[in-house]
């Protein structure tokens, strides 16, 4: 008896017509030839759960497995915790004479979960990483990637002599670039309580020692976030991206900060499409000076002949 539809489709052809167009029907537990209709196997096993759920609440109640493994927790989410509420499995209150015992059990359980210097380091660092990620509004994928970078740094003994906060910030910056969720060094430094210089220095050290290859950040990556914060339309975003792509083709972005180019392109696009924003507004969102925007603006309008004047 076969239970893997893909295995049958790869290894078997229809004995009647020779066609390899085999289709699985889980409702009837059959493998059927899509050309002649011959039933090739009628003992297909459904490997899914035996229960059905029609919403998230039912799915959470009926599933019998725990949360998936995550690198954002020092023990990867594999351990359990004693609930802080003094209730048993049936929801009844624990007798007062047993509460002191439960308090001691919780205390020992917390100590057991974090045993050793490495575990303590990971527990503190990953909580710091979660705090910084929340303040930056980063998605789950970036948090997982940053946690993996930090774990690699710990495994390779790269933490010694450096602050945990600095390594966490550098790991976050590397993860943002890897996942194409750009954040500037200034933004990372602002939430991490370490200087921009230290974040940059630690980032370069980690990428060199861990052999992390990251592509250069493109100005296009910053456009959606800046446009959203400025309240600009999708048409302005598209026009700004078009301007940036033209600038890249003409070599106008080489040696220029991506945030400055993105800010200038958005400013030009907003003027062209009648959704004008002041240079000060754009500069504040992009984290650059008004002088930078004017310089990039002048370069883009003159070299690309966009027909816009200050």
Curated annotation (Swiss-Prot):
Binding-site residues for Zn(2+), renumbered to this chain: 14, 17, 33, 36
Recorded superkingdom: Archaea
Presence of the UniProt keyword Signal in the record: no
One of the protein's GO biological processes: transcription preinitiation complex assembly
SMART domains tied to this protein: CYCLIN
Sample GO molecular function, one term: zinc ion binding
Zinc fingers classed as TFIIB-type: ranges: 9-41
Record-linked Gene3D superfamilies: 1.10.472.170, Cyclin-like
Sequence repeat residues: 127-210, 221-302
Annotated function: Stabilizes TBP binding to an archaeal box-A promoter. Also responsible for recruiting RNA polymerase II to the pre-initiation complex (DNA-TBP-TFIIB).
Family that this chain belongs to: Belongs to the TFIIB family.
Alphabetical list of HAMAP family matching this protein: TF2B_arch
Protein name as catalogued: Transcription initiation factor IIB
Species name: Methanothermobacter thermautotrophicus (strain ATCC 29096 / DSM 1053 / JCM 10044 / NBRC 100330 / Delta H) (Methanobacterium thermoautotrophicum)
């Amino acid at each position: 008896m076969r239970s893997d539809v893909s295995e049958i489709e790869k290894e078997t052809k229809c004995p009647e017509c020779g066609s390899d167009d085999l289709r699985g029907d889980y409702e009837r537990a059959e493998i059927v030839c899509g050309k002649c209709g011959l039933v090739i196997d009628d003992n297909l096993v459904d490997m899914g759960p035996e229960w059905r759920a029609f919403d998230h609440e039912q799915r959470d109640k009926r599933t019998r497995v725990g949360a998936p493994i995550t690198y954002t927790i020092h023990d990867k989410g594999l351990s359990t915790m004693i609930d802080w509420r003094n209730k048993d499995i049936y929801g009844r209150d624990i007798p007062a004479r047993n509460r002191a015992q439960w308090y001691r059990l919780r205390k020992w359980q917390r100590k057991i979960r974090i045993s050793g210097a490495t575990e303590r380091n990971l527990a503190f660092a990953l909580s710091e990483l979660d705090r910084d990620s929340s303040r930056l509004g980063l998605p789950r994928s970036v948090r997982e990637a940053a946690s993996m970078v930090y774990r690699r740094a710990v495994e390779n003994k790269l933490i010694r002599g450096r602050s945990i906060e600095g390594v966490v910030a550098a790991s976050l910056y590397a993860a943002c670039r890897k996942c194409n969720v750009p954040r500037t060094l200034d933004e990372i430094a602002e939430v991490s309580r370490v200087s921009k210089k230290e974040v940059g220095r630690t980032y370069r050290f980690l990428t060199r020692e861990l052999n992390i290859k990251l592509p250069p950040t493109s100005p296009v990556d910053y456009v959606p976030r800046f446009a959203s914060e400025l309240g600009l339309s999708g048409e302005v975003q598209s026009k700004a991206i078009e301007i940036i792509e033209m600038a890249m083709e003409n070599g106008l972005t080489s040696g220029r900060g991506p945030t400055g180019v993105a800010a200038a392109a958005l400013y030009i696009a907003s003027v062209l499409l009648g959704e004008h924003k002041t240079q000060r507004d754009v500069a504040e969102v992009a984290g650059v000076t008004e002088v930078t925007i004017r310089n990039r603006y002048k370069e883009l309008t003159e070299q690309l002949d966009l027909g816009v004047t200050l």
